[in-house]
Curated annotation (Swiss-Prot):
Alphabetical list of InterPro entries matching this protein: ACP, ACP-like_sf, PP-bd_ACP, Ppantetheine_attach_site
Pathway: Lipid metabolism; fatty acid biosynthesis
Species this protein is from: Bacillus cereus (strain ATCC 14579 / DSM 31 / CCUG 7414 / JCM 2152 / NBRC 15305 / NCIMB 9373 / NCTC 2599 / NRRL B-3711)
Protein name according to UniProt: Acyl carrier protein
MF terms in GO: acyl binding; acyl carrier activity
Domain Carrier residues, every copy: 2-77
Domain of life of the source: Bacteria
Keywords: Cytoplasm, Fatty acid biosynthesis, Fatty acid metabolism, Lipid biosynthesis, Lipid metabolism, Phosphopantetheine, Phosphoprotein
Amino acid sequence: MADVLERVTKIIVDRLGVEETEVVPAASFKEDLGADSLDVVELVMQLEDEFEMEISDEDAEKIATVGDAVTYIESHL
């Protein structure tokens, strides 16, 4: 999990301009990290590129927190 979490954290920090310490598994992209809907779509696209996978729109809607993203990626690698 550490490797996936580290890679996800780097993408979030780069995309949203938040501090690395704010990117914890329980952090909500919208409420805690200040992302808007477009930011979330762009994050999903970056995660798809980084992990060489496709995340369906239906699954993307269920990814609301950093932990959700890490869990999803780990279960689909």
